[in-house]
Amino acid sequence: MAWSGNKAAVVLCVDVGVAMGNSFPGEESPIEQAKKVMTMFVQRQVFSESKDEIALVLYGTDGTDNALAGKDQYQNITVCRHLMLPDFDLLEDIGNKIQPSSQQADFLDALIVCMDLIQRETIGKKFGKKHIEVFTDLSSPFSQDQLDVIICNLKKSGISLQFFLPFPIDKNGEPGERGDLDSGLDHLKPSFPQKGLTEQQKEGIRMVTRVMLSLEGEDGLDEIYSFSESLRQLCVFKKIERRSMPWPCQLTIGPNLSIKIVAYKSIVQEKFKKSWVVVDARTLKKEDIQKETVYCLNDDDETEVSKEDTIQGYRYGSDIIPFSKVDEEQMKYKSEGKCFSVLGFCKSSQVHRRFFMGHQVLKVFAAKDDEAAAVALSSLVHALDELNMVAIVRYAYDKRSNPQVGVAFPYIKDAYECLVYVQLPFMEDLRQYMFSSLKNNKKCTPTEAQLSAIDDLIDSMSLVKKNEEEDIVEDLFPTSKIPNPEFQRLYQCLLHRALHLQERLPPIQQHILNMLDPPTEMKAKCESPLSKVKTLFPLTEVIKKKNQVTAQDVFQDNHEEGPAAKKYKTEKEEDHISISSLAEGNITKVGSVNPVENFRFLVRQKIASFEEASLQLISHIEQFLDTNETLYFMKSMDCIKAFREEAIQFSEEQRFNSFLEALREKVEIKQLNHFWEIVVQDGVTLITKDEGPGSSITAEEATKFLAPKDKAKEDTTGPEEAGDVDDLLDMI
């Protein structure tokens, strides 16, 4: 089909004669198959925002409506839609107006009407291509009297033809066999008349073959498609193919060497256009909705203020730091302009693939028609390739952009050579995690048989097939040719909702699900290794033993006074800390494995200041919360409790209170409600002035701090004193 990047004028010429509606039981009629092909083609054009203009002409209709119609000429031919941009109305016309009739019309007459429509409606417009697509089963009679004249006018006007038939045609212009097309889906199989082709259809094939050979030569038969072949090619929505814009710049190495270059985006992450708008639910019009923004003070009267009386503020902990427009402009990075400067070189082995980041990949070429630049860049590319080196580059798109640091590595192909640029992370972009070693746990040490089984499984799941004889590597799962299922699902649902307002959305199309399945060849190869792994790694249910609680545990003697008991607990913790510190060696910072013990050790031994150690602990708390897992929530709680205890002991109450207030705001922003419920249940609140002299928080304020913001604040009553053992026995 004509889905070229150039603007095209396309006429869909559809046979709706009586024979197009005939079908055998269990088969779709030719007209239904033709409607499917046209629908898929038009919906591609709609969602790709194509500038092509499309018209719709039906022949074999009960009525007549075209500019050439006379008393006995060009009858039963209807121009259903003139040339215009495709839209959902055209899709509705294809679905509703294309129905089989009781008449027939001359195919060549319909072709003349289409040619006339293109010539008249393209006057004053620029089109790269003019195209007619014919959908027919060739059952309608036709007169070949003017065939040579039609072919001559098609060539003269630069109009190309494509035919879409219910059955395939081979390279010799003969009807194909049932086995000619290998279809993976039953509903895409070619439709063959069970009693063979009629004489009229055979005559039509000869006429179509003659026309296409006259227009396109031997390649003309490639423009004759079967409905099933077209459906397979069109079953995936495609976005418009955008031509990469050149980015000219100077590649500089030191102060004295510069090379004129031009860069193109090779890979860029495709994103949805933000086209969602709010409309009135009854009229479905955007204009019926008015949006008004009002700024109010956070007081009882909600006093309204004008936008001119407001400025931006940056929230830092519990404080808001004001920033005016002047401040924002002064804060912005002032760049000298676009830049592609080499900072230095390093071995390619030092730049690991896991460091690649960003949303695009650039290919850097020498400037066009600059021989000196081409020689210089080629020398650089080959030198890097021979030495296994890469260039570390400072990249800035323009003077408004913040600079990036990236890697440029050589890329040499038979047809061209260039540098490929990928962004690298800064220090803040890296996430460091520490995990306990599996090697130190003897229970986790695999046997040789288990290691061998996993090796075999990995080998069997390889998505690369190597042909040893031809030394060719074949990709069994080419991701660059697999459409994004998110886009496909959105387009499918938008199309369905536009045409069927009241119906439920359809399920995901099966061919999309099939594309995401592992290759059949790979699944067959990994069956045996999988069964071997299942045998060598048996899964057994672990039943957690309940801790038996004795009467002594319940009614334990507690003759110690409060302060003494607290002192005993502290000494016990210190013993534990010293033992763990001996196991870990010299502790110089708070780690992620034992953050509580590390924190206590650092502040008590005065290896680090309380401020420094607390900042390290807070960093780990934030990392634990980012995982959004209950296990790490509990670990965060242990850290917070330790922070609170040590803050009281070292008179750092205000530091802990500021942290907890900032934590609550962060929890609300990230919607970590489950974690905050744990905080409330454990009663971890602000440090009051009764607990530490450095705090100004009252007990009432500390209690209100844990109360939900959306609920009315209620006065809290003090906890009742716990009863003694005798009271408990009386209750029993």
UniProtKB/Swiss-Prot annotation:
Keyword Ion transport: no
Post-translational modification N6-acetyllysine, affected residues: K265, K332, K666
Protein name: X-ray repair cross-complementing protein 5
Role, per record: Single-stranded DNA-dependent ATP-dependent helicase that plays a key role in DNA non-homologous end joining (NHEJ) by recruiting DNA-PK to DNA. Required for double-strand break repair and V(D)J recombination. Also has a role in chromosome translocation. The DNA helicase II complex binds preferentially to fork-like ends of double-stranded DNA in a cell cycle-dependent manner. It works in the 3'-5' direction. During NHEJ, the XRCC5-XRRC6 dimer performs the recognition step: it recognizes and binds to the broken ends of the DNA and protects them from further resection.
Domain VWFA intervals: 9-161
Gene Ontology cellular-component annotations: chromosome, telomeric region; cytoplasm; DNA-dependent protein kinase complex; DNA-dependent protein kinase-DNA ligase 4 complex; Ku70:Ku80 complex; nonhomologous end joining complex; nucleolus; nucleoplasm
Record flagged with keyword S-adenosyl-L-methionine: no
Notes concerning its domains: The EEXXXDDL motif is required for the interaction with catalytic subunit PRKDC and its recruitment to sites of DNA damage.
Enzyme's top EC category: hydrolase
Biased composition (Acidic residues): 717-732
Organism ancestry: Eukaryota, Metazoa, Chordata, Craniata, Vertebrata
Family: Belongs to the ku80 family.
PTM annotation (Phosphothreonine): residues: T535, T716
Record GO biological process: activation of innate immune response; cellular response to gamma radiation; cellular response to leukemia inhibitory factor; DNA damage response; double-strand break repair; double-strand break repair via nonhomologous end joining; hematopoietic stem cell differentiation; hematopoietic stem cell proliferation
Domain of life: Eukaryota
Annotated organism of origin: Mus musculus (Mouse)
